[in-house]
Amino acid sequence: MLQLYFFPMACSLASRIALMEAGIEARYHLVDIWTKKVLEDDSDFWTVSAKGAVPVLVLENGERLTESAAVLQYIADLKPELGLAPRPGERDRYRLQEWLSFVGSEIHKAFLFPTFWYRDDAAKAAARERIGKSISIAAEHLAGRPYLVGERFTVADGYLTWSLLLLGRGGVDIAQWPSLVNYVAHMQERPQLKAAVEIEMRLRKTVKV
């Protein structure tokens, strides 16, 4: 069975969404990302990943996979018939990688990471100044289309949905981008995605921030 190390409502939520959308059972290990402890047994998370970051996906052979873009594509490829990622070699596979990279670098690392991790107000303000342009790119792309890539839900949609849900907590109101408001509402109509978010929202209340 796959195992996922996660922190509630962190970027690892996208991996939970992918697993649930794929119908793949997994064992979930909650990590305190501040103390670097695995909460179920108080073990040292650094022994799981030298990066000290979630997600970490433990494969059935014991190998460990990190970084959201890699983890999400791995999960999608376990159930290729579901189309959670275009098949390797298809042109849209590169579009998927394009959007995974964009969300990871331009929204996640450029804004969400400094907003929730940095203590320096100047750094947070600088991140907030830049985020509007990045969000506008996603909003323009999604105007008149239901998904980031092609005509169906992919793991990139799960990753973007997570980031958009957190923007409000970071002081950015997506109401100024109607296409994104519609997109998030559309995504939350998906039973498995909605259930994944609800699970992590409940768990978030049990951990210190």
For the regions a language model picked out, list residue spans one by one.
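GST-like domain detector, emphasizing the conserved glutathione-binding G-site
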Residues: 1-126, 139
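Active-site-flanking alpha-helical
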Residues: 18, 76, 163-164, 197
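Residue-level "edge-of-site" marker
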Residues: 32, 113, 180, 200-201
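Generic structural signal for helix capping and beta-alpha/helix-loop junctions
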Residues: 36-38, 184, 204-205
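Short beta-strand(s) of the beta-wing in winged-helix/HTH DNA-binding folds
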Residues: 55-58, 148, 194
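Residue-level recognition of oxygen-bearing side chains
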Residues: 70, 179, 192, 198
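GST-like fold's C-terminal all-alpha helical module
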Residues: 91, 99-191
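Terminal-tail/helix-coil boundary detector
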Residues: 198-209
